[in-house]
Amino acid sequence: MACLSRIDANLLQYYEKPEPNNTVDLYVSNNSNNNGLKEGDKSISTPVPQPYGSEYSNCLLLSNSEYICYHFSSRSTLLTFYPLSDAYHGKTINIHLPNASMNQRYTLTIQEVEQQLLVNVILKDGSFLTLQLPLSFLFSSANTLNGEWFHLQNPYDFTVRVPHFLFYVSPQFSVVFLEDGGLLGLKKVDGVHYEPLLFNDNSYLKSLTRFFSRSSKSDYDSVISCKLFHERYLIVLTQNCHLKIWDLTSFTLIQDYDMVSQSDSDPSHFRKVEAVGEYLSLYNNTLVTLLPLENGLFQMGTLLVDSSGILTYTFQNNIPTNLSASAIWSIVDLVLTRPLELNVEASYLNLIVLWKSGTASKLQILNVNDESFKNYEWIESVNKSLVDLQSEHDLDIVTKTGDVERGFCNLKSRYGTQIFERAQQILSENKIIMAHNEDEEYLANLETILRDVKTAFNEASSITLYGDEIILVNCFQPYNHSLYKLNTTVENWFYNMHSETDGSELFKYLRTLNGFASTLSNDVLRSISKKFLDIITGELPDSMTTVEKFTDIFKNCLENQFEITNLKILFDELNSFDIPVVLNDLINNQMKPGIFWKKDFISAIKFDGFTSIISLESLHQLLSIHYRITLQVLLTFVLFDLDTEIFGQHISTLLDLHYKQFLLLNLYRQDKCLLAEVLLKDSSEFSFGVKFFNYGQLIAYIDSLNSNVYNASITENSFFMTFFRSYIIENTSHKNIRFFLENVECPFYLRHNEVQEFMFAMTLFSCGNFDQSYEIFQLHDYPEAINDKLPTFLEDLKSENYHGDSIWKDLLCTFTVPYRHSAFYYQLSLLFDRNNSQEFALKCISKSAEYSLKEIQIEELQDFKEKQHIHYLNLLIHFRMFEEVLDVLRLGHECLSDTVRTNFLQLLLQEDIYSRDFFSTLLRLCNAHSDNGELYLRTVDIKIVDSILSQNLRSGDWECFKKLYCFRMLNKSERAAAEVLYQYILMQADLDVIRKRKCYLMVINVLSSFDSAYDQWILNGSKVVTLTDLRDELRGL
């Protein structure tokens, strides 16, 4: 039975960039102590062309309570360090070695000594390199390192006797294990230099014998694993499985045990171990040894000092491995430790074992029950994360809906930027690109590569116990780690659903539901889930009863989608349960968490990226399982006619939980980084989350996060509101607003809730869906309906203290003025206009004007009225609605000054794109009114138009004179009209006789229309010209 599950933690997965912010490169030179640093530009110095990025990785707990991660590259020439707590914002340090390590990571040691990382490595050229990196440099933003930070020396000729294992004993002493089986001590003599010390053995003489006899290396019995006991004894295991104990005070071998002879296995099954590795683990005085017998054997023993003061090894028991013989598993790491919080009846010691087969890994825990070492049990783990187990989900969405953009977003959210970009790079290198009508095929290829890349990135390298007992697996790819989390009861049920284990009534009930649900397609389950959301959001009308809603779900989603025999099996099995009791147990004891307070936890005082990721990923796993169970339980109410009076409260609670679970899962897909920020802020004293050191603290904290999720209000959900504020109000350009609309807002906003519908309209607008946005903005009288119901962050926009640049500030500020309706639609019109949606801008400004006329009793500021009219005019001009333009100009004298009206008329009369149509409209309207004996324009406007038209006369163009003549004639200014024609005659010296005659006749006809002879005259400057004068001039042509 699997009791632990795996949580993958890529430390960069919550960020847009696939590499950390700050990378520093240090170069070790053979010639001099190079203190110069080269700051990295874009990535670490060894981007990964192969599936994995390093030959080894591990993580050390330092004296400042920080964890430092290190990676040794696959070529053994690059050493990389980064902080576990904040790999993205912290500093990544790359140290470039002058030569490769002699034997990969086995001739490398890293320890903390006096606030420094002390790194020792034997290079292939036989030199011994020492690095000293201050912790203050590792955890600061500084990119310079003062003083001597590396030293190269040759304390021994390692080209003669080749080392294959370097072991750290103390800051002053290390042990080199040689290929010929010998041991060599390296002692620091002056704080810098080392001198060799030979152990009292005959390995050197044996090596000479082999050299002259030309014996092969297979004759050697080299050390393959080593542990230090009480800082005095070396406990070593050799290739031939001899356990040897060396006394470091005398450099002599004091014990030599043949481990194979102490096993019950057939010695003929023994195979020599060639490679150095983790075959020993020591806790207090208990030693465990992995022996290569049969399918693997763990020998348990104790180290004790006998009466003569000699350290001895006492055999206790042999425990076979618990591995299937169908695969070849090799050991990665093993850690013997005190009992973990595994919820077992008895425990004396735990052995954590990490295996590997290809790129797959397996973690097991051997629980030794008591001191006899005879009673034990194997505890298994789920060795794939829930994300991996559900990896088919995203492509189903793409395949069925054809929504390629959503498919991309889902995949990138699931795998993170680093893995996503690596997968795209692989496809590009293989000439696989997205072509027209081949989107789904490309996404299928991308998903396959993503899985492979993620598997390679997560290949296990070592184990670190985080805090007191939390199992952290370090992966070969930098920034990739996995944590094995102790399962809750519900998680245990989920992961062991297909096991033969008998459990409680609730477990049997859930297994029954899961059996039927597994016969339905993912499409059917998704459609049912969406319908359950519709019940909460109001998409299904509230006027329908619960039974009617479930009937609708059955007909639309389930009818003809299952086998009747499967339904009968489900019905028969459900009859064996007391369902109300089982549901009470599920909801109240397993799903709904207890009450937690921030003071129950140790709040972190600074950001910790690792714990943030682990917290969110653990919550995501829990909610995913809760969501699946909740959906399956609700499904039974759709299938069977259950009494809603008995189950009404259960249904209501489950629908509420389903909504909140589904919302958080979609927010997780939308933006993990933002969701983590919200969760940590709401659950800790200083908004940075909490520190946890054991499984009990971790599980309790996840339960507290779950409590925050389940206790959140649906109508004003804090998680939903925070995402809305970030995506719509703050509107940072890098955020995918359209994905937010489709993934979060559309499915989850509450219909018939004025505030949420107003917010939905804002989101539609931000996505460019202006027609839908306008429609939603018309649903309610928002300035009245929601003015005192706005969530805090929208209320803040109305404050004078708000200094942000949100496009929504001015719109929301209209709620605070008396004339809020006209102001609201004016600002809404401006928003549409600025986004090139003039059609809806015009509709909004028209409604604004309507409200101004309707609410005449509400006084509007003069400045507002002017701006409103100007905006209205601009939109009318845009659509060439010149009749309406003239109405606004002639009726808006109270709002528009003479200067403003003049500017508009000047634009319309002088700009070629408007002048012809506008002037013809003006003449038509003037003519229509003159027939009734009225003037269309006010006198002041007539003067403005006349003045503008008169300005054009300087050109001498006949059309300009004709326009002014016509305008004056239609506005009862006949004498002035005649004068403009006479002015034209005088200006045109070379005017032909025929046109000049026509002009004279027109002037004469105008003057002839005056009844009195005393009125038959015009002015030419200060001179009076009579009708008689004009006739004489005409005769003189």
UniProtKB/Swiss-Prot annotation:
Residues 131-152 are annotated as: Leucine-zipper 1. Coiled coil: none annotated. One of its GO terms (cellular component) is nuclear membrane. It is a peripheral membrane protein. Disulfide bonds: none annotated. The modification Phosphothreonine is found at T417. Keywords: Coiled coil, Membrane, mRNA transport, Nuclear pore complex, Nucleus, Phosphoprotein, Protein transport, Translocation, Transport. Functions as a component of the nuclear pore complex (NPC). NPC components, collectively referred to as nucleoporins (NUPs), can play the role of both NPC structural components and of docking or interaction partners for transiently associated nuclear transport factors. NUP120 is involved in nuclear poly(A)+ RNA and pre-ribosome export, in GSP1 nuclear import, in NPC assembly and distribution, as well as in nuclear envelope organization. It comes from the Eukaryota. InterPro entries: Nucleoporin_Nup160, NUP120_helical_saccharomycetes. This is Nucleoporin NUP120. Component of the nuclear pore complex (NPC). NPC constitutes the exclusive means of nucleocytoplasmic transport. NPCs allow the passive diffusion of ions and small molecules and the active, nuclear transport receptor-mediated bidirectional transport of macromolecules such as proteins, RNAs, ribonucleoparticles (RNPs), and ribosomal subunits across the nuclear envelope. Due to its 8-fold rotational symmetry, all subunits are present with 8 copies or multiples thereof. GO terms for biological process: double-strand break repair; mRNA export from nucleus; mRNA export from nucleus in response to heat stress; negative regulation of transcription by RNA polymerase II; nuclear pore localization; nucleocytoplasmic transport; positive regulation of DNA-templated transcription; positive regulation of transcription by RNA polymerase II. Residues 290-311 are annotated as: Leucine-zipper 2.
